[in-house]
């Protein structure tokens, strides 16, 4: 048994070369003959136990120290180097006029930085001291307690952290600018590269309000004296919850009054998500990566709860359903899915678990359970859980036990069904007079999955009255007092299942449908179309009832579906996609509220991509681009690119190169990915290899281009030629597999055999699940071409 109490770490950096020398003292106890430290890419120089130098051996991932049983101090002297090839461990994040050094350790990359016991359950305190060149700012989890000049450099000594896991340690070095809110505890600090920090005031206010919300909800104060929000110019993920030093890509942290509604929504959600982790993940941490979903789904769930409280007019739970639940339902419909609680044998498998199942499905199940036990019972259960396991480790069963104790009934059997089984059910509903027949089966887009039985907490509205029923067998029948005239199942879509009204869909339209109900019908029928359960005529008959709808959820869901159909086959689906988007453009043109402006922005951009005639007129606004509001700009830029093609390249490229803020830069990039001519899109993709498109933006670039039906071959060919480049850029992140799952179903249309052959023959264990998902979705999408 090994117990680690404390790391005392000294690091001496050369900012110019990226080399550093390290010396650490690990206060610990061990009854093992050999202590095994995790270390990757580090050179171990010397090891001592209680002052005595001892033998060690080193391989690619571990250091074996022949210590014998001891209690005391393990000292390790080592050397490391900042990487420029990947975006994990300790790496160089470049920007136009320089670079910063930053770290990204989750899940298993603290070992790339220092020799350590890189396991979430082996919590310890960290005391960090860093010596670095003058003129730089150094950021870590805790405040600087002492700063002094020494040998022409500056030494920064940081306060000691609370007990925490290695993956939450952070170090950033660079020419950072900062703004502070010191009015209350904790101090909130936003740090950016020069010239961008003023765009951090919105996220600073979100942070203050979110912390106050969480302190009240969890009944536990934020535990550190400060929290840094750090914008990193190259960052693989959206953000990372390092305790007290949260890192973000710039588009997930920076926004102001000139930003689009989408940008503000994104910043608010990501900031609130990472702050939720400061309690749920940092204060109480998973025992092992099997329960990764608990960290991520809970932070996703709580961020939407917080933003709904802070901005009631944003209707953020609608936004949750449209983005989180919708994506999770699709990814959970194929054989390559996994249970929410998936057994992780090797830490290297962890990266593939940061997906729509761990985030979106997990959060949707939490929403379902909260509805089942009640909001206050759910909250009190969470509070008890956090207080019981503070500064310690826990697992999913501990949370269910805490909620069950408050609720007064054991919820574990229901939870087990939803978190240990892959997939989800479809409930087939048929009506005859007073009888409602229910039948469940596991839903699949391709039909190649094991059928499973689920405990489904059904909610139904029959003739205007709400009824609940636990469907825990394959078939069941309910008999009502009078003939069923109106019926809807899964009221307000709180349940994670689909409903197929067998020859009775008109009964649904006799019901009073909420916005969430309408979204559910549209989303279900899209899935049934993809699965081949209905034909396009039946799908069109159902969705046509919502063509002139004026609610955010159904309109944006239909826009997503019709835009996808257009990407699959523009000749076949352009007419219906154009008709819908033209109707809705009129409905939302004069919207003033946030959801209305967001919807208008989406409709405008997509209509420009679909309708050449509309683009021709809209492109005339490009001459006034600088004075346009931010919600209009994307549509205008796309229209300009489509209308002028070759003649727009120089202008768009020049603006792309000059722009310093990523939000605007990505608008120009998106426009250049919607050229009609494939070679122009290919030229845009070449900006990846030149480094003009950041590594962090490669996935977004490819998924955006995949929705251009005229560029499928260009995108597929680029990926085939440069798959090894992408693999190296995203090594250790799991991002490549997740993005291929989104891109393959579209770029493979019309080249199914070529696509399947290429991706099936790749030996890429780190992307295996994502590739499998993409190829299965390609089979479903190909049915519609």
Swiss-Prot record:
Its cofactor is Zn(2+). Keywords: Aminopeptidase, Cytoplasm, Hydrolase, Metal-binding, Metalloprotease, Phosphoprotein, Protease, Zinc. Transmembrane segments: none annotated. It catalyses: Release of an N-terminal amino acid, Xaa-|-Yaa-, in which Xaa is preferably Leu, but may be other amino acids including Pro although not Arg or Lys, and Yaa may be Pro. Amino acid amides and methyl esters are also readily hydrolyzed, but rates on arylamides are exceedingly low. Substrate binds at residues 106, 238-242. The keyword Cytoplasm applies. Can be phosphorylated by cell extracts. It is an enzyme of class 3 (hydrolase). PANTHER family: PROTEASE M1 ZINC METALLOPROTEASE (PTHR11533), PUROMYCIN-SENSITIVE AMINOPEPTIDASE-RELATED (PTHR11533:SF174). This is Leucyl aminopeptidase. It comes from Saccharolobus solfataricus (strain ATCC 35092 / DSM 1617 / JCM 11322 / P2).
């Amino acid at each position: 048994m090994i117990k680690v109490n404390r790391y005392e770490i000294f690091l001496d950096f050369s900012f110019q070369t990226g080399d550093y020398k390290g010396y650490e003292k690990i206060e610990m106890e061990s009854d093992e003959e050999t202590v095994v430290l995790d270390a990757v890419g580090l050179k171990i120089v010397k090891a001592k136990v209680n002052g005595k130098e001892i033998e060690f051996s080193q391989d690619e991932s571990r250091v074996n120290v022949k210590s014998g049983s001891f209690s005391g101090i393990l000292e390790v002297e080592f050397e490391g180097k900042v990487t420029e090839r990947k975006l994990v461990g300790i790496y160089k994040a470049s920007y136009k006029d320089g670079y910063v050094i930053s770290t990204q350790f989750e899940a298993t990359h603290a070992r790339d930085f220092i020799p350590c016991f890189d396991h979430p359950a082996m919590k310890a305190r960290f005391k960090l001291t860093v010596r670095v060149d003058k003129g730089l700012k150094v950021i870590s989890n805790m405040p600087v307690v002492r700063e002094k000049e020494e040998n022409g450099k500056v030494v920064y000594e940081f306060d000691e952290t609370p007990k925490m896991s290695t993956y939450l340690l952070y170090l950033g070095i660079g020419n950072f600018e900062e703004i502070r809110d010191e009015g209350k505890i904790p101090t909130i600090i936003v740090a950016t590269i020069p010239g961008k920090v003023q765009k951090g005031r919105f996220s600073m206010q979100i942070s203050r309000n979110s912390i106050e919300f969480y302190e009240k909800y969890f009944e536990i104060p934020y535990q550190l004296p400060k929290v840094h929000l750090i914008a990193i110019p190259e960052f693989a993920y959206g953000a990372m919850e390092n305790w007290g030093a949260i890192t973000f890509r710039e588009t997930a942290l920076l926004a102001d009054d000139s930003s689009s509604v989408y940008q503000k929504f994104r910043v608010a959600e990501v900031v609130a998500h990472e702050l939720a982790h400061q309690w749920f993940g940092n204060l109480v941490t998973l025992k092992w990566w099997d329960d990764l979903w608990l960290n991520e789904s809970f932070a996703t769930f709580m961020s939407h709860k917080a933003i709904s409280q802070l901005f009631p007019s944003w209707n953020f739970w609608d936004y949750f359903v449209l983005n989180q639940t919708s994506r999770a339902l699709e990814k959970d419909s194929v054989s390559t899915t996994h249970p929410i609680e998936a057994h992780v044998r090797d830490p290297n498998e962890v990266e593939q678990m940061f997906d729509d199942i761990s985030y979106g499905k997990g959060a949707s199940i939490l929403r379902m359970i909260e509805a089942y036990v009640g909001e206050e019972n759910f909250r009190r259960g969470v509070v008890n859980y956090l207080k019981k396991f503070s500064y310690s480790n826990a697992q999913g069963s501990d949370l269910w036990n805490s909620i069950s104790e408050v609720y007064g009934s054991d919820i574990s059997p229901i939870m087990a069904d939803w978190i240990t089984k892959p997939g989800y059910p479809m409930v087939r509903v048929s009506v005859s007079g007073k009888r409602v027949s229910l039948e469940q089966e596991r839903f699949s887009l391709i039909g190649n999955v094991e059928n499973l039985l689920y405990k489904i907490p059904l909610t139904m509205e029959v003739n205007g009255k709400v009824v609940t029923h636990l469907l825990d067998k394959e078939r069941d029948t309910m008999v009502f007092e009078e003939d069923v005239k109106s019926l809807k199942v899964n009221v307000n879509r709180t349940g994670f299942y689909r409903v197929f009204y067998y020859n009775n869909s008109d009964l649904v339209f006799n019901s009073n449908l909420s916005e969430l109900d309408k979204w559910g019908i549209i989303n279900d029928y899209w899935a049934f179309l993809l699965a081949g359960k209905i034909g396009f005529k039946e799908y069109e008959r159902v969705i046509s009832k919502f063509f002139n709808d004026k609610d955010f959820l159904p309109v944006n869901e239909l826009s997503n579906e019709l835009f996808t159909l257009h990407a699959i086959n523009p000749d076949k689906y352009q007419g219906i996609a154009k008709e819908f988007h033209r109707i809705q453009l009129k409905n939302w043109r004069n919207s003033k509220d946030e959801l209305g402006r967001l919807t208008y922005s989406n409709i405008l951009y997509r209509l420009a991509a679909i309708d050449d005639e509309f683009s021709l007129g809209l492109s005339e606004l490009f001459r006034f681009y600088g004075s346009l509001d931010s919600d209009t700009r994307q549509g205008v830029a796309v229209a300009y690119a489509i209308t002028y093609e070759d003649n727009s390249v120089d202008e768009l490229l020049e603006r792309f190169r000059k722009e310093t803020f990523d939000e605007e830069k990505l608008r120009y990039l998106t426009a250049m990915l919607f050229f009609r001519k494939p070679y122009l899109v290919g030229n845009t993709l070449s900006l990846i290899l030149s480094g003009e498109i950041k590594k962090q933006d490669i996935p977004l670039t490819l998924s955006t281009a995949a929705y251009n039906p005229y560029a499928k071959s260009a995108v597929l060919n680029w990926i085939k030629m440069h798959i090894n480049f992408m693999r190296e850029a995203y090594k250790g992140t799991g991002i490549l597999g997740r993005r291929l799952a989104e891109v393959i179903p579209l770029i493979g249309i019309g080249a199914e055999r070529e696509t399947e052959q290429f991706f099936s023959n790749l030996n890429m264990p780190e992307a295996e699940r994502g590739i499998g998902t993409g190829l299965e979705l390609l089979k479903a999408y190909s049915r519609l071409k």
